[in-house]
Amino acid sequence: MKLMIASDLHGSAYYTQALLRRMEDEKPAKLVLLGDILYHGPRNALPRDYDTKKCAAMLNALEKAPLCVRGNCDGEVDQMVLDFPLLADFAAVFADGYTLYLTHGHHLDEASKAAAPGDIVLYGHTHVPAFEQKNGNYYVNPGSVSIPKEGSRHSYMLWENGVFTWKDVETGEIWRTERIEK
């Protein structure tokens, strides 16, 4: 199952539109959003073309609703303008024989406790792409669509058949690939 995974859009209409253009090209079975969808948060500068209403309208117009988890910048007011569930702190996806736990990252310890050995924990929050194995689990972060940190790219990630592929949201260029070993 091909999943398109992104995090930390933070209300950037420019980068949300770029992500949705990539989605047209990628044709995933599902778009997974790991939180911080509309609000930029008090610690972040305003992202390019900050327009929460436009961002919400683009996401609401999707033919298939994205699967989302709540980020630390997401709240009940955001849910009032989005037509798909946003307020779950955790979710799980079963794909290609793997269990993928979804969380934003500010509750990463709780998600780690729920994961069985060999499971994959997907998280955002740090705005920094990551792929690491610890305590028998994989921890994978797509980075940020709109406000990347530590010199990383504006990015999203694909999952298909045990492989994660990171891509630049503006160009679609592949810049990292990692395989899960069972």
What are these regions (language model features)?
Residues 2, 27-30, 53-54, 64, ...:
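Context-gated lysine
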Residues 2-95:
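Core catalytic region of metal-dependent phosphoesterases/phosphodiesterases
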Residues 3, 17-21, 158-160, 170-182:
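Catalytic phosphate/metal-binding cores of nucleic-acid and nucleotide-processing enzymes, i.e., regions
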Residues 84, 88, 96-101, 106-175:
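Conserved beta-sheet core of the metallophosphoesterase superfamily
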